[in-house]
UniProtKB/Swiss-Prot annotation:
This is 4-hydroxythreonine-4-phosphate dehydrogenase. The active site is located at the dimer interface. Binds 1 divalent metal cation per subunit. Can use ions such as Zn(2+), Mg(2+) or Co(2+). Its cofactor is Zn(2+); Mg(2+); Co(2+). It is found in: Cytoplasm. It comes from Burkholderia vietnamiensis (strain G4 / LMG 22486) (Burkholderia cepacia (strain R1808)). Belongs to the PdxA family. GO terms for cellular component: cytoplasm.
């Protein structure tokens, strides 16, 4: 008996940005790349058609085969590169439809194109970001943002804190919180990435990982105790290591993931190494969610100059994760 196709939902994000065109471009070879998957594109059908034409992509990919379009009408006409708060709720409606479908079991994974946070806020809806919204909608108390490269041994970087001002990071780090974060990373790398024994390297917070307390005590008072407790739970998490030396091949060779303490500690290295083909994964959710690792790129929208590599990688990772989860 042939297994049922994996069902992947794609939200096309901010209509003035590159999301609609990158979605169509990334799906050009979908039947060959992902023969066991079906893709549902959530967005305005006319917008997708127009943006595909603008960048020279084959619009026929949206008309059958492994790809279908779930039409959601724009609230106002969309023009490449020009934001309109009238479409803020449209963007959120796409995300809600994908989340609802995944929670109901209709989708095995969702892939999100970039959105503009300001547009949603300007529409009167308080919105911090995809990650926080997904956690709220799925009633998940703790999620973990992880960005990753591609290839046989990809660099993966997870974050202990996400969109926080730097002055608030230290207070946000707790022993229990770090243990929970490490447990989520360990579980999801096993279940959704097929890793039998994940190894996680953990950065310190302070320069030189605190220099034995002379440059800060978070490593001694919070991070090291969290690592000890995680070890008692069978989690292979090592550190804390100075972040300025950890990201070297000789350290990363045996690592499956790096846990950084804050956003701009871990992500610049990863984006430098992978930009254009990196992806974002939200760990800890009851559903699978991946996305591109870049923003709306308003200046590139409709020009054909935006690179679909990250969207292809996000789709590929979503399919891979869905295969593992279905088999688990």
């Amino acid at each position: 008996m042939t297994a049922a196709a994996l069902q992947i939902a794609i939200t096309t994000g901010e209509p003035a940005g590159v999301g609609p065109e990158l979605t169509v471009q990334a799906l050009q070879d979908a039947a060959r790349r992902w023969p066991d998957a079906q893709f549902t594109v959530l967005g305005d059908a006319a917008l997708l058609d127009a943006r595909a034409a603008a960048v020279g992509a084959d619009r026929a990919v949206l008309a059958g085969g492994p790809v279908s379009v779930q039409h959601h009408p724009l609230a106002a006409p969309a023009h490449a590169g020009t934001l309109d708060a009238a479409n803020g709720r449209y963007v959120l409606a796409l995300l809600d439809a994908a989340i609802d479908g995944a929670l109901a079991g209709r989708y095995d994974a969702i892939v999100t194109a970039p959105l503009q946070k300001s547009t949603i806020n300007d529409a009167g809806v308080p919105f911090t970001g995809h990650t926080e919204y997904l956690a709220e909608r799925t009633h998940t108390p703790r999620v973990v943002m992880m960005l990753a490269g591609t290839g046989e041994r990809p660099l993966r970087v997870a974050l202990a804190t996400t969109h926080l001002p730097l002055k608030d990071v230290s207070a946000a780090l707790t022993i229990d919180g770090l243990v929970d974060t490490l447990a989520i990373i360990d579980r999801d790398l096993r279940r959704d990435f097929g890793l039998a024994a994940p190894r996680i390297l953990v950065t310190g917070l302070n320069p030189h990982a605190g220099e034995n307390g002379y440059l800060g005590r978070e490593e001694i008072d919070v991070i090291a105790p969290a690592l000890a407790r995680a070890s008692e739970r069978g989690i292979d998490a090592r550190g804390p290591y100075p972040a300025d030396t950890l990201f070297q091949p000789r350290y990363l060779a045996g690592a499956d993931c790096v846990l950084a303490m804050f956003h701009d500690q871990g992500l610049p290295v990863l984006k430098y190494a992978t930009f254009g083909e990196g992806i974002n994964v939200t760990l800890g959710l009851p559903i699978i969610r991946t996305s591109v690792d870049h923003g709306t790129a308003l200046d590139l929208a409709g020009t054909g100059r935006a690179d679909p590599g990250s969207m292809v990688a996000a789709l590929d990772t979503a399919v891979t994760m869905a295969r593992h989860r279905r088999a688990s």
